[in-house]
Amino acid sequence: DVERSRGLGDVYKRQDVDVTKGIIHHEEGLDLMPCNIDLSGVDVSLVNAMSREFVLKTYVESMREFYDYILIDCMPSLGMITVNSLTASDRVLVPVQAAYLPVKGLEQLITTIYRVKKHLNPQIQFEGILISMLNARTNYAKDIMELIKKYYGESIPIFESKIPFSVKAAETSAAGVSIFTLDKKHPVAQAYEKLTKEVIAHE
């Protein structure tokens, strides 16, 4: 069993955290480091911390030897957790829902990424922009895709893969399984498989 007190909150709040604690070994071949309620207070706890932008990077560097890939999933926020995640990363994949407000917020995120690249992590590169929750049958979604290509297509790669909107895919969280376990032939599963191949091809 995973120690419930362990998680990303511990990584941010304790310099002496045991890097092997709090990791869940999932039957589908992935290791997960979940967050807990402690993560909600991280921005406040890091206000006076030394090298506060590099806390997660220090942890990630200690884990690199054990993994081929380490994926950091960020909440839609521009706070210290996101800055830490960008500082710790080699590449950044930017998912954006095919809707007006998420695309409008994309500008702020990309500005933050460029600032991190300039001041904290010169090595970080854009993996690309991934359009998600797409209903390709609507003119609205097509207009959103054209908008993304117009403003970002020349400077940031845009994945050919698109993740379609699906209620069934959303149900995977409640079921506690991936879309591949639920239905590996589902369009969302096929889209993620295509995306994975596209990402690997970029290496």
Named regions from a protein language model:
Residues 19, 52, 56, 144, ...:
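Hydrophobic side chains within well-formed alpha-helices
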Residues 194-203:
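C-terminal alpha-helix
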Residues 17-22, 26-72, 76-78:
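Cytosolic-facing regulatory segments adjacent to core modules
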Residues 1-12:
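Single conserved hydrophobic/aromatic residue that forms the stacking wall/gate
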Residues 173-188:
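C-terminal boundary of histidine-terminating zinc-finger modules
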Residues 64-164:
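Conserved catalytic-core segment of NTP-binding enzymes
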Residues 164-171:
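Short, glycine-rich, amphipathic interfacial segments at transmembrane boundaries or analogous
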